């Protein structure tokens, strides 16, 4: 039976700063699990399989089965419902909250964080399997049980038409279909296995233009595997890393997630690396193309992209640029004497790869550059210590649920979820009943703050200050993020106001000052906050965005979510420490509020870039402005935002927004105008902050009724459609949101609507 293990090391090649706090890995143990537990696991797997086309999102049931046995909760209060025409009583809200928090406390790990699924994208696992296959360690890293669960996941998320999407809820794409088909073949599935599934997948590929029409990232992966020629790729010259930093196009000015992906890609491209040509590779050359491999026009293939994948079409200037680099630049740098510069650039790239690896304890900023960096380390030296240090950290990215084993979009969302969970529980004004839960969470948050900057000259490594920040996941990961720092900061400040005998000692003031310093350092000149770093270049650089599948990825843009979170954190700090950098903080808050007003859409909404979508962005927009001192009566932006949200409430009383809002940038209801507990929570929080209860509380009562009646018998809330997003077009799972935001919204509703303003 599979078991989720928390904060464990046990491998001599693992490095850690804090005894692996937050680490979550799944291990298979054939000697555990009662017959009843094993039967329950098989039952939920079968249920997912039988309903996979109607309900594409797993509900993290394997973790729930394990924790139900390990963390038995107190006696569950009887379930309550609100009938039509019935007024909502404070008692029913309180019972719902206690049931919800009692259940959610059982999902907390012993180190204080809440583990959960952070999967969703369908293009991550292929990179891992391709890399393991090339480097010859597939069977070392992945046991037969791992392979079985990965295959289960891939088959479960194959669409009816035979293809695979960019993410679990998306329509079939060439990128998703080719890579997942290849992954299954590398895992040992035959070309006609899967009860016809492989044949359907292959037919989808051939019917839609064949693998020559895969996206640029797909072309790169197929090229290193040996199923595509490098001449069919647009250039990624490593020499760009030797350019003067003053140039706007220097890669050090890119958004760090893109920079850290194109860094190892440029190494592999610069070396034209190709893995061993195995019988499976030779067979794939026949399976995924519609003409014989040796007859493919690779130059034409460079710019081919299936229409199903084309979210960001290449502008003409980009095609001219790639053609120039391909026909002029590359022939020069592949031969002496210019080849000397190529070799120098490759050495520079590897220095940056090693710096990234070492400063994330070989976790890396994300799963794409994790496996690419690992492959580059192997290409540089197959017997290197760096390659061996990479191997055990692969398991940090693997998550298991009833739909199978997936690769997550990070090594988890540990800090992010815990910071929100703390704020949600405290909002209920019932915190004294959940002291042990909050104490453990407080300990986790104190253990997860980044305590040092990266070593060396930060400018030379294109890094921002880190000391005092909070990461998205774990301290071992360590990359600082503006909104994660702000949300973590808000949570520890709220905890500091509770009795220390209940929640533990507060964070030392010096570490709070470090957090303030990070937040202030991340504000751009326009008042907005980006994610990891300052915005370092210009939006016109999107003209050279080579990733057809993603939008707005080349630079680190300022976002309403990050800007609002910074306002909230600085305001909370200012109230507790009014003398520390007072004028700087006040000036920062005012600039940030003006930025939020400036980027509001004409319909009153804000576009959410990290959650689905306008309900998420508008919650942050309203919250930021209210925290900065604006009110409904004094601020037209807040009035417009409230009108927008109220116009989107559906007949059931809730809100339900489709992921299509993200990619199309137009508010789109869920199919059938259904509600979603997470969207409903966000909208409620926004409207409560904007004083909706003082004007007309009816919309809030209707929404609260929806949340109360959505609660499950055990106190959990249902997993509904996917609610996270990145790069405008790819969705990602936040499994904890279904618990956090109903608790938070009902907590605020209980204290600020039913009980009235304090």
UniProtKB/Swiss-Prot annotation:
- What Gene Ontology molecular-function terms does this entry list? cycloartenol synthase activity
- Entry annotated with the keyword Membrane: yes
- Provide the membrane topology annotation: Single-pass membrane protein
Q: Could you tell me the Gene Ontology terms of the biological process aspect for this record?
A: pentacyclic triterpenoid biosynthetic process; sterol biosynthetic process
A GO CC annotation given for this chain? lipid droplet
Keywords, alphabetical? Isomerase, Lipid biosynthesis, Lipid metabolism, Membrane, Repeat, Steroid biosynthesis, Steroid metabolism, Sterol biosynthesis, Sterol metabolism, Transmembrane, Transmembrane helix
Listed InterPro entries: SQ_cyclase_C, SQ_cyclase_N, Squalene_cyclase, Terpene_synthase_CS, Terpenoid_cyclase/PrenylTrfase
Q: Which SUPFAM superfamilies match?
A: Terpenoid cyclases/Protein prenyltransferases
Q: Where in the cell is it found?
A: Membrane
PFTB repeat intervals = 147-188, 512-557, 589-629, 638-679, 700-747
Q: Which principal EC class is assigned to this enzyme?
A: isomerase
Coiled coil start-end: none
| Cross-referenced CDD domains | SQCY_1 (cd02892)
Give the residues annotated as active site. 483 (proton donor)
Mind telling me which residue stretches traverse the membrane in this protein?
Answer: 122-142
For this UniProt entry, what is the primary localization, expressed as one broad class? membrane
Q: Where is the signal peptide?
A: none
In Pfam terms, one family for this protein is: SQHop_cyclase_N
What does this protein's UniProt record list under function? Component of the phytosterols biosynthetic pathways. Oxidosqualene cyclase converting oxidosqualene to cycloartenol.
Instruction: Report what the protein is called.
Output: Cycloartenol Synthase
What is the protein's species of origin?
Panax ginseng (Korean ginseng)
Q: The organism's lineage?
A: Eukaryota, Viridiplantae, Streptophyta, Embryophyta, Tracheophyta
Q: Which gene encodes it?
A: OSCPNX1
């Amino acid at each position: 039976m599979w078991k989720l293990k928390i904060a464990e090391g046990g491998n001599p090649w693992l490095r850690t700063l804090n005894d692996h706090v937050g680490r979550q890995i799944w291990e298979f143990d054939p000697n555990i699990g009662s017959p009843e537990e094993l039967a329950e696991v098989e039952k939920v797997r079968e249920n997912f399989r039988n309903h996979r086309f109607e309900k594409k999102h797993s509900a993290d049931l394997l973790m729930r089965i394990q924790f139900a046995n390990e963390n038995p909760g107190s006696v569950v209060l009887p379930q309550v419902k609100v009938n039509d025409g019935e007024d909502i009583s404070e008692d029913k809200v309180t019972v719902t909250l206690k049931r919800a928090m009692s259940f959610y406390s059982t999902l907390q790990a012993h180190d204080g964080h809440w583990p959960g699924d952070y999967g969703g994208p369908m293009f991550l696992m292929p990179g891992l399997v391709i890399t393991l296959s090339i480097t010859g360690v597939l069977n070392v890293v992945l046991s037969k049980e791992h392979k079985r669960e990965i295959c289960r996941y891939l088959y479960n998320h194959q669409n009816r038409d035979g293809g695979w999407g960019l993410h679990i809820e998306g329509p079939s794409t060439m990128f998703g279909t080719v890579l997942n088909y290849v992954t299954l073949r590398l895992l040992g599935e035959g070309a006609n296995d899967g009860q016809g599934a492989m044949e359907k997948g292959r037919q989808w590929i051939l019917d839609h233009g064949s693998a020559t029409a895969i996206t640029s990232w797909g072309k790169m992966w197929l090229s290193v595997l040996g199923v595509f020629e490098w001449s069919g790729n647009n250039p990624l010259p490593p020499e760009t890393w030797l350019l003067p930093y003053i140039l706007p196009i220097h890669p050090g000015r890119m958004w760090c997630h893109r920079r850290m992906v194109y860094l190892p890609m440029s190494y592999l491209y610069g070396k034209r690396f190709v893995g061993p040509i195995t019988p499976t590779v030779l067979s794939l050359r026949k399976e995924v193309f519609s003409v014989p491999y040796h007859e493919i026009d690779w130059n034409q293939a460079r710019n081919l992209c299936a229409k199903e994948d084309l979210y960001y079409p290449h502008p003409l200037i980009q095609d001219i640029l790639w053609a120039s680099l391909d026909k002029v630049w590359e022939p020069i740098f592949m031969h002496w004497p210019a080849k000397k510069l190529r070799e120098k650039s490759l050495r520079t790239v590897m220095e940056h790869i090693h710096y990234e690896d070492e400063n994330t304890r070989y976790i890396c900023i994300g799963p794409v550059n994790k496996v690419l960096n690992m492959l580059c380390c192997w290409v540089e030296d197959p017997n290197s210590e760096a390659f061996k240090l990479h191997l055990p950290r692969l398991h940090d990215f693997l998550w298991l649920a009833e739909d199978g084993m997936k690769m997550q979009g990070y090594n988890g969302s540990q800090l992010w979820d815990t910071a929100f969970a703390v704020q949600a529980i405290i909002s209920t004004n019932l915190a004294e009943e959940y002291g042990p839960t909050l104490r453990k969470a407080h300990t986790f948050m104190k253990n997860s703050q980044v305590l040092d900057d990266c070593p060396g000259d930060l400018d030379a490594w294109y890094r921002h200050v880190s000391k005092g920040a909070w990461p998205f996941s774990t301290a071992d990961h360590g990359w600082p993020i503006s909104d994660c720092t702000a949300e973590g900061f808000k949570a520890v400040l709220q905890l500091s106001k509770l009795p220390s005998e209940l929640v533990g000692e507060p964070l030392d003031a010096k570490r709070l000052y470090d957090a303030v310093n990070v937040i202030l350092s991340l504000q751009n000149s326009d008042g907005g906050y980006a994610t990891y770093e300052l915005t370092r270049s210009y939006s016109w650089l999107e003209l050279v965005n080579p990733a057809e599948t993603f939008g707005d990825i080349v630079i680190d843009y300022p976002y309403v979510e990050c800007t609002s979170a910074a306002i909230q954190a600085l305001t909370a700090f200012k109230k507790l420490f009014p003398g520390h950098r007072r004028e700087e903080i006040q000036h920062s808050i005012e600039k940030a509020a003006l930025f939020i007003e400036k980027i509001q859409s004409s319909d009153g909404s804000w576009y959410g870039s990290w959650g689905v979508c306008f309900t998420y962005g508008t919650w942050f927009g309203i919250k930021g402005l209210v925290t900065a001192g604006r009110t409904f009566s004094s601020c037209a932006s807040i009035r417009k935002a409230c009108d927008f949200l109220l116009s989107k409430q559906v007949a059931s009383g809730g809100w339900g927004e489709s992921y299509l809002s993200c990619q199309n940038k137009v508010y789109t209801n869920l199919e059938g105008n259904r509600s979603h507990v997470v969207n409903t929570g966000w909208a409620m929080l926004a409207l409560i902050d904007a004083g909706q209860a003082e004007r007309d509380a009816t919309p809030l009562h209707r929404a609260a009724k929806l949340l109360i009646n959505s609660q499950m018998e055990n106190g959990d809330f249902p997993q509904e459609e996917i609610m996270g997003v990145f790069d405008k077009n790819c969705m990602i799972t936040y499994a904890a949101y279904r618990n956090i935001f109903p608790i938070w919204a009902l907590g605020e509703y209980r204290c600020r609507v039913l009980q009235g303003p304090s």
